[in-house]
């Protein structure tokens, strides 16, 4: 029985028994219910450690499409859970907290994009995966930061393209592909917080460190980077590099996996422009906790549901992306 209080909160706030081994109980429930836990690199390290799969948006979408599990629990944000439901309509898709939104996805309401699209007939619409299902349904193809360049370059040079919603990623893609895509004016609140000044300060005290940046960062930050790439690409670069120190300009949750893969190396998160924090965290990602994950598996709620027509329309651009990424 799902309590009205839980529905109002968007998550189950039932206390877990004192002394419970949460990780063991989560694994027991997964085995009992044929469930898999998918966790994004930006979630808390404890959540990543208990997950069946940890990855970036592209990897998690590919896993969701292929897994034989009956239940998918998405420890990430809402658009990721929607993507799982789009690709796996017959599976029960759960998310530990319905409040886990995304500032970038919210910067592009579907009705506003539909109007913008109508004002620019003849343009193809390329949307970042950080969008709602309703926005995806309006697009020709979806991209992640891993495959965005390859997808954009798959279009003819003279193709007219609208890129939504991240203006920073779009600007980066325009620069590296020599395009002039029309850019939606959206941004990620985490990556928008990185500043040139903070990176210059860190470089002065760590002169041999390599600067790794996500393409959602502003152009001035990207200009200081030794490497620009998706979370998966940043991880790979750090593993292969001879450098021993890295200044990391993306959400700090990724440092957990970086340290696991490269225990002998030092990873320094770039702090936000303001505030006392030494790292830049996504508050939405941090809504995923072990307690909520346990309760979500126990009660099989909150669920993610989509209208079937919307799901079918949103699936087409995702499938095109996955086909290009094989």
For each predicted feature, which ranges?
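Active-site loop-to-helix "anion-binding N-cap" substructures in soluble metabolic enzymes
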Residues: 1-229, 233-248, 255, 260-270, ...
């Amino acid at each position: 029985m799902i309590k009205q209080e839980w529905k109002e909160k968007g998550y189950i706030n039932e206390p877990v028994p004192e002394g419970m081994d949460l990780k063991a109980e989560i694994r027991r429930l997964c085995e009992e219910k044929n469930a898999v836990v998918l966790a994004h690199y930006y979630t808390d390290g404890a959540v990543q450690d208990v997950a069946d799969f940890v990855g970036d948006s592209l990897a998690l979408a590919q896993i969701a499409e292929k897994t034989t599990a009956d239940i998918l629990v998405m420890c990430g944000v809402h658009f990721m859970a929607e993507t799982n439901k789009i690709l796996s309509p017959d599976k029960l898709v759960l998310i530990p907290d319905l409040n886990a939104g995304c500032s970038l996805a919210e910067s592009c309401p579907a009705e506003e994009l539909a109007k913008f699209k109508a004002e620019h007939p003849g343009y193809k619409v390329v949307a970042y995966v950080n969008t709602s299902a309703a926005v995806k349904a309006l697009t020709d193809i979806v991209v992640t930061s891993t495959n965005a360049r390859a997808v954009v370059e798959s279009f003819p040079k003279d193709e007219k393209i609208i890129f939504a919603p991240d203006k920073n990623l779009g600007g980066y893609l325009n620069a590296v592909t020599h395009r002039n895509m029309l850019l939606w004016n959206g941004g990620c609140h985490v990556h928008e917080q990185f500043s040139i000044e903070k990176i210059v300060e860190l470089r002065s005290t760590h002169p041999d460190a390599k600067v790794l940046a996500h393409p959602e960062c502003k152009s001035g930050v990207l200009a200081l980077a030794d490497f620009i790439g998706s979370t998966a690409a940043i991880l790979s670069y750090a593993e292969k590099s001879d450098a021993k120190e890295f200044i990391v300009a993306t959400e700090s949750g990724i440092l957990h996996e970086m340290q696991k893969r490269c225990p002998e190396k030092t990873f320094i998160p770039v702090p936000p422009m303001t505030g006392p924090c030494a790292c830049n965290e996504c508050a939405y990602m941090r809504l995923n906790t072990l307690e909520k994950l346990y309760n979500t598996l126990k009660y099989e709620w909150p669920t993610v549901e989509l209208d079937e027509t919307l799901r079918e329309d949103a699936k087409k651009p995702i499938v095109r992306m996955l086909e290009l990424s094989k």
